[in-house]
A protein has these predicted regions:
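A glycine-anchored, Pro-Gly-centered beta-turn/N-cap motif
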Residues: 280-287, 320, 332-334, 657
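Terminal (often C-terminal
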Residues: 241-303, 307, 348-378
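Short beta-strand-plus-loop segments that form exposed binding edges in beta-rich domains
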Residues: 339-346
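Solvent-exposed serine/threonine-rich low-complexity stretches and specific carbohydrate-binding patches
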Residues: 311-320
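Exposed aromatic-hydrophobic patches
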Residues: 322-329
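Polar, S/T/G-rich
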Residues: 1-258, 353-388, 392-411, 431-438, ...
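Short beta-strand-centered aromatic/proline hotspots
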Residues: 86-95, 657-667
Length: 681
């Protein structure tokens, strides 16, 4: 019998002597392949003792000021025999009363990875600080980012409306990329293109914003399969900005410095001021705030204020000093940025865009509060202009951060756990299992009175697909081939009639079919490949966020024509082409982001065999569909050494056979465990 100890917010709580606390552990479950799991306990009860009542602040009493906030999980740790076992969080489920007095509290323990979802919340990608990539949207910059050799931020050859082609014998300005002369009308107009950002930069920004660290097992610059992927910065269909807005362009106020005495309660990141939910949530409160704008002239200007990248306030056509206060909008938690626009040049000197906010910190046992007051001022001069500024938080696709990460995890079959150093270890599932060589023999601990051997195959078929298959060529492919572009329906080349369900792994991104251009005069292949982001009516398309590989074409390439105006263009012999494969030659790499083997758009061949299914899912899924695979259920009384040492990628040895752990449920006081094991075939 182990001694169970539970600490909540560093306070050891009292436990019932006979309370049973069981923890469930699984990281990849054969019944729900696309999900990543975390440890959790069954809901259990602890007594309403003096210590526990103080911790939960007599939660049953509605009238108590500064009560326990059950909307939030609290940090917790489970110890066994005074030795740390699991760190995580507890959630208060409720209070049981007897004779109108508190008798017990119902709580649930969750492993540390559950905190990731809580941290990210409903934040969208626009809440991330990617302001270092903000850039004017102009012919010069579009051209420069098409030719740049450093690929963190590029212009790929993807058009939002115009269809492109190549004809060395033609000289008509309707999308012909052939460069005839500097005064011809051939070429792609620069504003038909948009920028793209490397996915790695987004993941780096996630780590910075939420103060988390991912391991470099997968998210690493040396992993080209990951590092060469990009996100197209496409937030609205068609043009980046409608033509009627071109006369007024907005400039972001770049950076704030603390004017009030330190330490600050709020904080800054990039070009924004962060207001934590801690300070907007009861018992803490925001008392007031003021944005102040002091221009050097009396010219007309417009103010826009953003929270997490979404505009929440606008004051149009104002002059002179302006104040924006709590009478204009409510200050909720988030990152606040400011942009100023004008049809003329308006200057705001350093320090003349200001954000002052004050509030109270409550929550002490005696109900006392502490007042705080922060003032932030712009750290550089802001000057409006007539060139449109491409701000990443306004142009990045509308998508929650958690959905973005979940999409990547499903795409590459990644799994995650938190190590002793607090790092979130992210690995492909195959690598996770390969990382452990430890086998635990449990023969002597197994209850031989009862066990079962069940069918391990819960599905007749597993479908892998992208949710976004709405562009013209992807739709056309589906109509002609009767399958989704890049989609696979896996059933191990057999039709099973015992299981009846189909499991779907669906990725929340758009998946384009690209076009390699052929010279209409003579029929020779060019080095040009482009993406046409339109719907099946050949009209501008919104779609889902687009992920693609970018490949630099710079030697022995076909020059293309980039148009500045209708009668002015420039020849470009280096440019970034989009691709579903990491390379344009399978001798360099066969990696691609299809699930099924498809004809490569650039080569026309089928040698790019490194699909997502082949590289990330095949080993696990083929094992699931193997006729020899069984799901064995046993009960065992595990000793404390195994309970402490067991990792979910370890093997279990039972009766001279090795097994993978599908799930394990353990009573932490008795060691009684129920194990689901998958035999290794």
């Amino acid at each position: 019998m182990q001694k169970l100890q539970l600490f909540i917010s560093n306070t050891r709580v009292d436990l019932f002597k006979d309370e049973s606390v069981s923890i469930n552990q699984t990281i990849q479950n054969v019944r729900d392949i696309a999900k990543i799991f975390t440890e959790f306990t069954q809901t259990f009860t602890i007594p309403a003792s003096k210590t526990n009542n103080k911790l939960f602040k007599h939660y049953h009493n509605y009238d108590i000021v500064n009560t326990f906030d059950a909307r939030r999980k609290e940090a917790a740790e489970i110890q066994l025999n005074n030795v740390p076992f699991k760190k995580g969080f507890i959630r208060l489920e409720g209070v049981q009363l007897k004779k109108n007095k508190p008798y017990s509290y119902k709580i649930t323990f969750f492993g540390e990875t559950v905190n990731l979802k809580d941290l990210l919340g409903d934040d969208e990608l626009s809440a991330l600080d990617l302001s270092s990539f903000d850039i004017d949207y102009s012919f010069g910059n579009i051209k420069n980012k098409m030719q740049t050799s450093t690929g963190g931020f590029i212009t790929p050859l993807i058009t939002h409306t115009r269809q492109l082609y190549f004809d060395s014998g033609g000289n008509v300005g309707n999308g012909n990329l052939h460069y005839a002369s500097s005064s011809s009308s051939n070429g792609v107009f620069w504003s038909d293109l948009k920028y793209a950002i490397r996915l790695h930069e987004i993941v780096q920004a996630i780590q910075t914003k939420y103060s988390i660290t991912f391991s470099n097992d997968f998210f690493d610059s040396s992993n080209a399969t990951w590092y060469n992927l990009y996100l197209w910065l496409h937030r609205k269909k068609g043009d980046v900005e409608p033509a009627q807005q071109v006369s007024m362009q907005f400039k972001t106020v770049t950076g704030f410095g603390l004017e009030s005495d330190p330490p600050a309660t709020t904080s800054v990141s990039g070009n924004g001021v962060n207001v934590s939910s801690t300070y907007t949530t009861y018992p803490n409160t925001i008392l007031g705030f003021t944005f102040t704008f002091i221009p050097t002239t009396t010219d007309v200007y417009t103010i826009r204020i953003f929270r997490n990248g979404s505009q929440i306030f606008q004051a149009e056509d104002v002059t002179g000093t302006q104040l924006v206060t709590q009478s204009d909008f409510t200050l909720a938690s988030g990152t606040y940025t400011v942009a100023i626009g004008s049809t003329s040049t308006v200057t705001f000197n350093s320090g003349n865009v200001r954000f002052a906010v004050n509030g109270n910190l409550g929550g002490t046992d005696d109900g006392s509060v502490t007042a705080w007051n922060d003032e932030w001022r712009s750290s550089s001069q802001t000057v409006t202009g007539t060139t449109f500024e491409f701000r990443i938080n306004e142009q990045i696709p509308k998508m929650k951060v958690i959905d973005f990460l979940t999409g990547l995890f499903r795409m590459f079959n990644l799994t995650a756990f938190i190590n002793d150093a607090g790092t979130i270890v992210v690995q492909k599932l195959d690598d996770f299992y390969a990382a452990s060589s430890i086998t635990h023999n449990i023969d002597e601990y197994v209850d031989i009175k009862s066990s079962s051997v069940d069918v391990a195959l819960p599905f007749k078929e597993i479908d892998f697909a992208y949710k976004g298959l709405g562009t013209f060529l992807s739709k056309q492919f589906e109509q002609l081939e009767n399958k989704g572009w890049g989609t696979i329906e896996y059933s191990a080349d057999s039709t099973f009639d015992a299981p009846s369900d189909t499991y779907k792994v669906e990725i929340p991104f758009e998946h384009l079919q690209y076009q390699r251009l052929v010279n209409a005069t003579g029929g020779a292949n060019t080095s040009i490949q482009f993406g046409w982001f339109v719907d099946d009516n050949k009209e501008s398309f919104y779609g889902l966020p687009l992920i693609f590989y970018a490949i630099k074409q710079s030697s022995s390439t076909t020059a293309i024509s980039l148009k500045n105006t209708e009668t002015s263009n420039q020849s470009m012999s280096s440019y970034w082409i989009p691709s579903n494969s990491r390379a344009i030659s399978s001798s360099t790499s066969t990696d691609n982001i299809h699930f099924d083997l498809e004809v490569n758009e650039y080569t026309g061949g089928s040698t790019f065999t490194g699909t997502l299914f082949e590289n990330c899912y095949k080993t696990y899924i083929q094992d699931v569909f193997n006729a020899g695979r069984r799901l064995t259920k046993v009960k065992a009384k595990l000793p404390l050494k195994i309970i402490f040492d067991l990792k979910l990628n370890d093997k279990i040895s039972l009766h001279n056979r090795n097994y993978r752990i599908n799930s394990i449920k353990t009573n932490l006081t008795t060691g009684d465990s129920s194990l689901e094991l998958l035999n290794i075939v």
